[in-house]
């Protein structure tokens, strides 16, 4: 069965881009007799607010977009709020660490902005792997000095190809197009890429509709599906 999802972040009122994605996802799923899930991506509790999450549901109802499970209604894969699913992300991160695919990154935001890594055509900066080669002693010294590291995925030298419903076949070379991306921030907040993959897999999502600005997330998420 086709299972799609709409997964907004309740950090403000929905805009036309959000609503357009919701409508396309809903119509795509329902035209094939599938199920539509509403998931609230509220991991960043400093920016996300419960009243915005409630407004999402009100807006969808006003538009006549009825979800089959999720949101405040719950369902078999509850909870549908990412802030309540952190134990699942911890388990996934532990699995990746056990496979040697994770390393700490102590780069500051200023260092990342100043990095001489190549920039994608869409303006995104690819992490240059500054901390990838740190030894256990290097890491211990930084941690002893009170520095908290973020956690990154060690990206292999591989190519990922996927089919986009609008653009057709898209191919990206992971080291230069994605780089070693974040799994958990230095403040302990789980990164979008990890949480989305864990949730989509757990909820049996078979189709994702996203804006062009999030297209670069697709190869990262496909890569994470393999070990998880």
Residue spans for each PLM region:
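N-terminal Rossmann-like or analogous alpha/beta NTP/dinucleotide-binding catalytic cores
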Residues: 1-120, 212-228
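Active-site cores that bind ATP or allylic diphosphates and position pyrophosphate for catalysis
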Residues: 110-228
């Amino acid at each position: 069965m086709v299972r799609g999802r709409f997964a907004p972040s309740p950090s403000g009122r929905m805009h036309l881009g959000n609503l357009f994605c919701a409508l396309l996802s809903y119509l795509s799923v329902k035209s094939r007799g599938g199920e539509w899930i509403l998931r609230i991506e509220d991991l960043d509790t400093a920016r996300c607010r419960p009243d915005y999450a409630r407004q999402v549901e009100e807006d969808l109802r006003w538009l006549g977009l009825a979800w089959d499970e999720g949101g405040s209604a719950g369902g078999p894969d509850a909870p549908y709020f990412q802030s309540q699913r952190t134990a699942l992300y911890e388990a996934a991160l532990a699995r990746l660490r056990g496979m040697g695919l994770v390393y700490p990154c102590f780069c500051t935001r200023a260092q990342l902005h100043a990095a001489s890594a190549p920039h994608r055509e869409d303006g995104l900066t690819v992490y240059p792997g500054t901390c990838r080669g740190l030894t256990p002693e290097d890491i211990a010294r930084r941690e002893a000095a009170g520095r908290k590291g973020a956690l990154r995925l060690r990206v292999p030298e591989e190519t990922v190809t996927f089919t986009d419903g609008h653009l057709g076949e898209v191919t990206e070379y992971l080291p230069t197009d994605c780089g070693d991306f974040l799994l958990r921030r230095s403040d302990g907040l789980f990164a979008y890429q990890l949480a989305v993959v864990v949730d989509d897999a757990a909820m049996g999502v078979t189709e994702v509709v996203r804006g062009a600005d999030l297209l670069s997330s697709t190869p990262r998420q496909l890569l994470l599906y393999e070990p998880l």
